[in-house]
């Protein structure tokens, strides 16, 4: 008679167990490859932090800023570059890894096995989000050493920040999926991804942290996925007693639940579109059910 332990090991895995195992495998593999890729680590972690240091050293004259505002100004600047780093991870590093797998013929093998496209997508996205958090955290950590100041607005602010950050990341990682499919050459995919990141960052005023650089209607900064995500994080991470007198206005702060709901909606739509893309294009299967 089999023992209880043997029975537990011999029990067949359910569909959910298999799906979770596949998700975990893709997450671990993707994160490992991110960390092994020196170029990805440089562009995603070192470059944003260095860009922040260069900016405050050469382009921000703190002698003209009231002493009590210097920490805030550095915090705003760092937050913009932190989200820039997260964007580099979600678009450039994520697309680059997927292009490598497509180019190496791995998907010819994946299509021949019962691999769940959603497990593939969510596993990669979990690794991408984790790496993006590291990139963001490094910039914020470096900024604290330079005198940047932060303050949580409310007890629930960490949860809001996490949701906003993940929704922001989800949108760009799904964009990266379609970039990888459309541009299967790693070199060109990298050039396009970095170009999109840079244009997005600067044309929207450091992802919405410097509205004066944004040429269109400032109200759009509370609607666009990259700027809305950044501004929600800023609202809950910076000690801004009056947004009307700060560099973050106009527009008004994204303080309402509607702004967070819009971000969550962006993330949900991105996941749906990404799932369909993985099924129909990457895995060449039917519609997901």
Locations of regions flagged by a protein language model:
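Haloarchaeal acidic low-complexity proteome signature biased toward cell-envelope/secretome components but also
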Residues: 1-42, 50, 64-68, 82, ...
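Short alpha-helical transmembrane interface motifs in multi-pass membrane proteins
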Residues: 10-13, 76, 87-92, 123, ...
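Hydrophobic alpha-helical transmembrane segments of multi-pass membrane transport/permease proteins
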Residues: 34-63, 75-90, 135, 193-202, ...
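Transmembrane helix segments
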Residues: 54-62, 180-226
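Alpha-helical transmembrane segments of multi-pass membrane transporters/translocases
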Residues: 56, 231, 235-289
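Hydrophobic alpha-helical transmembrane segments of membrane proteins
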Residues: 66-97, 164-181, 272-275
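Hydrophobic alpha-helical transmembrane segments of multi-pass membrane transport proteins
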Residues: 74-147
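Alpha-helical transmembrane segments and their short interhelical loops
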Residues: 125-193, 198-200, 260, 271-272
């Amino acid at each position: 008679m089999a023992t209880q332990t043997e029975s537990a090991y011999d029990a067949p895995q359910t569909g959910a167990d298999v799906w979770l195992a596949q998700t975990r495998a893709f997450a671990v593999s993707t994160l490992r490859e991110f960390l092994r890729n020196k170029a990805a680590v440089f562009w995603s972690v070192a470059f944003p932090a260095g860009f922040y240091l260069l900016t405050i050293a050469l382009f921000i004259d703190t002698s003209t800023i009231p002493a009590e505002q210097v920490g805030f100004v550095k915090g705003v600047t760092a937050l913009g570059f932190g989200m820039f780093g997260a964007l580099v991870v979600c678009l450039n590093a994520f697309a680059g890894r997927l292009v490598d797998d497509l180019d190496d013929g791995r998907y010819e093998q994946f299509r021949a096995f019962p691999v769940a496209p959603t497990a593939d997508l969510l596993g990669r996205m979990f690794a991408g989000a984790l790496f993006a958090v590291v990139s963001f955290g490094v910039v914020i950590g470096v900024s604290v050493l330079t005198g940047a100041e932060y303050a949580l607005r409310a007890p629930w602010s960490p949860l809001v920040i996490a949701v906003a950050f993940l929704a922001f990341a989800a949108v760009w990682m799904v964009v990266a999926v379609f970039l990888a499919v459309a541009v299967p050459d790693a070199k060109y995919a990298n050039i396009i991804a970095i170009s999109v990141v840079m244009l997005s960052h600067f044309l929207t005023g450091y992802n919405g942290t410097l509205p004066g650089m944004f040429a269109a209607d400032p109200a759009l900064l509370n609607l666009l996925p990259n700027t809305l995500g950044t501004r929600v994080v800023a609202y809950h991470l910076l000690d801004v007693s009056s947004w009307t007198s700060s560099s973050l206005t106009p527009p008004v702060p994204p303080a309402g639940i509607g702004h967070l709901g819009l971000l969550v909606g962006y993330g949900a739509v991105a996941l749906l579109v990404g799932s369909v893309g993985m099924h129909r294009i990457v895995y060449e299967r039917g519609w997901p059910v």
